[in-house]
């Protein structure tokens, strides 16, 4: 929808429009990447525009009569790409918050090469501004990994990696305390129910020789499922839980655009 038409210097026509990429089975209309911007070929049948001629569905790529424009320092925003942030400078514009912070609760100068976040009582289950910095999921098949230093003191202190659609639809992979022991936990939001708006799906009790180590957390998206893993050396990975329902975060289930 919302199509604009563009004619190039050689007389060819293209359209810029919005669309979505559902995971299989396509008829279920489950997609976790939101509405996206597409550039598709078009032509005219009299005064009637014909989008994507020759195809029923929009294709993943087309040949364009243009040379790629890649300025110095360009960070890819579409297609297949890898992005890594060492947090050595100011916060990149690709990172987003949940609502506008009223004060600074993060720092890139407290420890060089680290993004330091303050522990605060606000959570992602509430319509507030929690200690949350994220990027949008841009791929159906992808993974996101963080390296983290965190030493919780009680069960209310948690930090980790979250995949979030809204306050009632998210999965949270974190390090915390449970029954007095250090653990890696996976939570699922409770879809508007009580139980503090999330419940535990699985956990791993951290061994004594692992407690003071950095922890690596990873979420892999594989179409309509997610996989949640952890490591203490970024080499040997353990799956905490696999084949987790990703459609729970889809627009069809959780709402939104």
Role assignments for model-derived ranges:
Residues 1-257:
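Carbohydrate-active catalytic/glycan-binding domains of CAZyme proteins
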């Amino acid at each position: 929808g919302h199509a604009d038409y563009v004619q190039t210097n050689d007389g060819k026509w293209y359209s810029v429009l919005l669309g979505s990429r559902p995971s299989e089975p396509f008829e279920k209309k489950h997609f976790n990447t939101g509405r996206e911007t597409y550039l598709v070929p078009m032509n005219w049948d009299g005064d009637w525009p014909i989008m994507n001629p020759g195809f029923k569905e929009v294709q993943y790529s087309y040949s364009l009569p243009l040379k790629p424009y890649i300025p110095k320092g360009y960070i890819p925003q579409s297609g297949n790409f890898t992005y890594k942030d060492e947090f050595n400078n100011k916060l990149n514009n690709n990172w987003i918050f949940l609502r506008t912070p009223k004060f600074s609760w993060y720092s890139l100068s407290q420890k060089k090469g680290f993004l330091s976040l303050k522990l605060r009582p606000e959570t992602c289950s509430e319509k507030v501004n929690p200690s949350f910095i994220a990027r949008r999921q841009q791929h159906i098949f992808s993974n996101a990994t963080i390296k983290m230093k965190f030493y919780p003191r009680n069960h209310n202190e948690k930090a980790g990696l979250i995949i979030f659609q809204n306050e009632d639809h998210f999965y949270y992979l974190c390090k915390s305390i449970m029954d007095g022991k250090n653990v890696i936990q996976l939570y699922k939001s409770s879809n508007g129910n009580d139980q503090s708006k999330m419940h535990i799906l699985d956990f791993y009790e951290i061994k004594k020789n692992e407690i003071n180590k950095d922890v690596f957390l990873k979420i892999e998206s594989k179409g309509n499922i997610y996989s949640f893993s952890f490591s203490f050396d970024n080499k040997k990975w353990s799956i905490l839980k696999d084949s987790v329902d990703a459609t729970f975060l889809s627009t069809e289930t959780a709402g939104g655009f």
